[in-house]
């Protein structure tokens, strides 16, 4: 089987979802295919969460990591309004533009069910703590934050999926084995089932679970790879005062 599309997106995490959302908005009627090795939003179920097992049994396809919504689908949904941490987009565009995009994404989340309530660490108490931290050469980063909550996070993703599901073609539970550059400048992807999909544009957003696979694909395509810096977070819990 061989089928042609305008755009093929690999991965239905946040990057893939919003790419599909924006393409439909900016180019209505675009012929778009989104592929993910996990299930749709309705059928993601971890056996630990459902109470079937007590510890990870290493499912061939992890429903916590894969499927519509990506690895963040079952998170508590914290949305940070800052460029101080969480990425390096300011290396490629002005900070003002990045903040406008952050606000825009938030508006889409609100449109699909997110709360409008935000929390801020720009408080006298936080400023005092920041001053104390500096005395020990520790730099406390402040930001406005929105807490979506796990259940609301899933509902937002479900609403977004239902908004775009009938506008694009989705292939869930489908693993891509190879990305190929065609002589005419187009791209083709080959699935585990032997299906071939070609496209004028390819957006690869395989997420954390597909990072190693994608790195190998890039090497096969002759693309240069750069090491990304890693943020290490430490969670410190203190007794309530």
Predicted features by range, described:
Residues 67-119:
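Dinucleotide-binding Rossmann-like beta1-alpha1 core, especially the glycine-rich loop
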Residues 2-86, 124-241:
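Residues forming the flavin
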